[in-house]
Amino acid sequence: MDDLEKKEHLPMTDRAEENKQAEGHLQKKLKELDKESNTAEYSGLWAKLIAVICICFSLFQIYTGFFGALDAMIQRCIHLSFGISLVYLLCPTKRSWVKDGNVHPVDLALAVIATIPPIYILLNYHQLILRAGTVTPADAFMGVLGIVMVIEAARRIVGLPIVIVVLAFLAYGFFGRYMPGPLAHRGLTINQMVGHLFFTTEGVFGIPMGVSSTFIFLFILFGAYLEKTGLGKFFIDIANALAGWASGGPAKVAVISSALQGTISGSSVANVVGSGSFTIPMMKKLGYHKNFAGAVEAAASTGGQLMPPIMGAAAFLMAEFVNIPYMEVVKAAIVPAVLYFIGVFLGVHFEAKKDNLQGTPRSELPPWGKIMKEEGHLAIPLVAIIGLLASGYTPMKAALAGIIVSIATAMLRANTRMTFNDVVDGLIKGARGALGVLIACASAGMIIGIVTKTGVGLKLASTLVDLASGNFLLLLFCTMLTSLILGMGVPTTANYVITSTIAAPALLQLGVPILAAHMFVFYFGIIADITPPVALAAYAGSAISGGDPLKTGVNASKLGIAAFIIPYVFVLSPQILGIDASLTSIVITTCTALIGMTGVSAGMIGYMADKTNLLERLLLLAGGLLLIDPRLATDAVGIGILAFVLFLQLMRKKKNAKNI
């Protein structure tokens, strides 16, 4: 009898206690794997003080969302002041310093000091405008202090890799005159760097911070309220009703529920822990190996950052960088995201057929009608925000409306109704949930500042083109590797900023449409979460399943193989993103990509209509990959190869059935 079966036979009180312990274990694992979740918990006066700061932070963002953002520099300074002070309070210098629920004096002092530089800008705003370009000694001191405090905040809540990358760019800015060849520049003085990075909207307070202080925060707050309503449970219940009974049902439930959860969340690790605590034990119970069970949830949850309407934070940056409305990014992302989840679903289906894994008996599944009656109203805010974005409302207004609608719709039934404390708790959770992205955006702004001040972006782009000798596919491969390597330690936001300023221009030089180039680096930055050896989402999945993290990551990469193919598809065939495309071209490109993914997925798993031998696996992979190329000849050959393998398997299966 395994652990899950033992648990089912426990008395109710013991089972409740075990569930509580399991929840505590999962939260501990989440904090180990996701620095944004690894915050200290205080009690008494300090807990109340931090809650008040969080509430004021959220109310400020709601106010400016309703009545319009303040001047760019003022809005971003206030945003940073709130955020950075909370980081120093919630992410202590040493965990051992958090005693008796009190903030250590050192962390309190740092929290106060960190707010001084942005407040200095607020108090001297007009004087700074009048003496633009001139940096006084006081300015220099405050600028250096502000940069140092942002970097230390990044170390605390984002991680050491982003700090290393930022310091490398700062060093390049200062020591540029000593760099070899085309990378050399005349070098920047301390005053030049400080003036550009801290007292303009080109560095810390640049585009990433602007997006964080307007769109991203409100969408995170919207997600916090959707979570409070219980929408995540509704998604799992709906997925169970749709696919729980099918072959490999629990795994398909994980894919569908994670796809739905991805519409409101942008964190791979948090998604794994949230839905995986339910789906992974169910998969193990019905026969999935623990490594594969963790991999299914990791691959599905990582895809959540690709699923509109609320994608990863980098998607909002993409809209600004490409200079298009956010809704255009959403529209472009729909078909690739659906293809990704179909690819994961196919992998799960083939694995279930290969190992003859059954679904959950229908008698154990929640009735569809009952789910919709009791919880269906929870989807109204999601429908509302999609409708508002499609109608041309700004992301700020749409997110604000979504927050109001989510609270209002929760009141429609007693089982989902929010109390005043729930509403306040949503404000607190929203503010805390935005801190990691906020600091990542501030750090990414410094990277952009150095790139724009030194011109290194175009130099590196030209170098990439030269290294690839103008070979288009080789350049795409190099760009993919860059995004994956950065994504192993740098959060998606900073990863996207770096690759979009360095690698994306190289793709543009070879004629790739700007949206396709940016979407290409965006995708691979996210897929790093399931790419070994780091693969944070896979580590989270293995922590729940009890599997091996590396093997879980390998399985997750196999399941998520679609994500490695789709970016090549939309660079070679931009029609799939809706770029200069007719409905016919979109349908044809989507269908060929889907057939190709089916072949590759079957080849990776080792099953199509029957278990494959080595030759059939190689043919399936080759046929699927040929369909990436949009030319008619390669499509015809690819489809022919896949049809041939399918025919062989059907004949063999028929022959084996007769012999039984």
PLM regions: where:
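Conserved, well-structured core domains of diverse proteins
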Residues: 1-133, 140-144
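Long, contiguous bundles of hydrophobic transmembrane helices that form the permeation core
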Residues: 7-47, 331-433, 536-625, 653-660
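Membrane-water interface regions at transmembrane-helix termini and the short interhelical loops
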Residues: 40, 64-68, 91-101, 127-128, ...
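Hydrophobic mid-bilayer segments of alpha-helices in multi-pass membrane transport proteins
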Residues: 50-55, 75-88, 106-115, 140-149, ...
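Membrane-interfacial loop-to-helix junctions in multi-pass transporters
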Residues: 137-141, 202-215, 241-255, 286-292, ...
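Core transmembrane alpha-helical segments of multi-pass membrane transporters/permeases
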Residues: 152, 157, 167-182, 190-194, ...
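Transmembrane alpha-helix interface/packing and boundary motifs in multi-pass membrane proteins
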Residues: 223-227, 258-267, 299-305, 445-448, ...
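Hydrophobic transmembrane alpha-helices that form the pore/transport pathway of multi-pass ion
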Residues: 236-304, 310, 314, 323, ...
